[in-house]
């Protein structure tokens, strides 16, 4: 009997774990059903994706989540489902999802492997492009490399480029994926330039306008939006070049397959709908051929 006790204890523990797993996996759906509330986090100051207040949130991602909520009301048979918006910071948004404080985040959240260590992601709904903003009167030593999409290669070019770029300072949004990207590029090019981490996109643009840094890297659409709204936007230049492209998706709790499936199904239906396509066109204009192809790739058949 004694010899079998460890085996029995192990089997009991295994059964208890197995019994607990389904409950955990269904946690978000159970919470949404029980509370009749979908709690949506968003990062203010990230226009055109998310902006405003909890009472009046706005932006493409926020409105997309509104359409998602309508679809989930039907899909989950929850006609009384309410949407509650909660402002978050970039630093705290993934933790809020992982801890169940919000059900997802309606902002431009890039889907990366590092972030997947903390949360899961829905199907993509947008492809974000990392761009840069500089002053229009920036010197050629800065404008030339950031404007060129396909640049010359070789030790002579690299030495010349680095010598010019080393004179300049750069900024990125703190806790964003741009930080790791910028550090990686600076290491690869052997740059000794200053890299500043700012608290908001608005601050990043402001210090470029004031000449405190030479360039600020962020999502290109966000930069264009801020340039259009800034009284001194005419002094700024946002080149067409994209330095990095990544899928944007809704962060979800890890290990919650039922909730992820529900969100993916609703999101696919929203993107395929007339309302979803009209929403995209209102914020970004009629999608080009490449954008249409990406939208089709993002969707899944039911």
Go through each PLM region and give its residues:
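N-terminal signal peptide c-region/cleavage motif recognized by signal peptidases
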Residues: 20-21
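Extracytoplasmic small-molecule ligand-binding "clamshell" domains
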Residues: 26-109, 113-117, 197
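Beta->alpha turn/N-cap motifs
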Residues: 41-46, 86-91, 100-112, 135-136, ...
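Periplasmic-binding protein-like
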Residues: 43-45, 126-141, 220-267, 286-302
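Ligand-binding cleft/hinge of the Venus flytrap
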Residues: 51-54, 66-82, 141-151, 158-167, ...
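Extended ligand-binding regions for polar small-molecule ligands
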Residues: 59-71, 136-159, 165-169, 245-287
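Acidic, polar ligand-binding/catalytic clefts
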Residues: 78-162, 235-242, 298-299
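A ligand-binding cleft/hinge motif common to bilobed small-molecule-binding domains
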Residues: 91-92, 106-118, 181-188, 206-244
């Amino acid at each position: 009997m004694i010899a079998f006790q460890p085996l029995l204890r192990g089997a009991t523990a295994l059964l208890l774990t197995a019994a607990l797993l389904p409950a955990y996996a269904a946690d978000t759906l159970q919470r949404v059903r029980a509370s009749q509330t979908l709690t949506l986090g968003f990062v203010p100051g990230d226009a055109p994706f998310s902006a405003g207040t909890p009472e009046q949130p706005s932006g493409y991602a926020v409105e997309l989540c509104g359409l998602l909520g309508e679809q989930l009301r039907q899909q989950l048979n929850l006609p009384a489902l309410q949407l509650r918006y909660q402002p978050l910071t970039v630093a705290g948004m993934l933790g809020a999802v992982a801890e169940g404080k919000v059900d997802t985040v309606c902002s431009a959240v890039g889907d990366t492997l590092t972030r997947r260590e903390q949360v899961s992601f829905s199907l993509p709904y947008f492809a974000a492009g990392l761009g840069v903003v500089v002053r229009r009167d920036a010197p050629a030593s800065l404008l030339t490399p950031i404007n060129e999409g396909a640049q010359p290669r070789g030790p002579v070019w690299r030495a010349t480029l680095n010598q010019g770029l080393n004179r300049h300072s750069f900024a990125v949004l703190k806790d964003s994926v741009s930080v790791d990207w910028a550090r990686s590029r600076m290491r690869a090019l052997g740059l000794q330039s200053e890299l500043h981490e700012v608290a908001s996109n608005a601050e990043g643009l402001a210090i470029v306008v004031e000449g405190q840094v030479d360039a600020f890297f962020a999502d290109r659409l966000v930069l264009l939006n801020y340039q259009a709204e800034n009284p001194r936007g005419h002094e700024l230049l946002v080149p067409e070049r994209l330095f990095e492209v990544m899928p944007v998706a809704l962060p979800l709790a890890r290990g919650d397959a039922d909730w992820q499936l529900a969100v993916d199904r609703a999101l696919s239906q929203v993107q395929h709908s007339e309302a979803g396509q009209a929403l995209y066109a209102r914020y970004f204009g009629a999608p080009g051929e490449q954008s249409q192809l990406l939208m089709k790739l993002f969707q899944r058949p039911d």
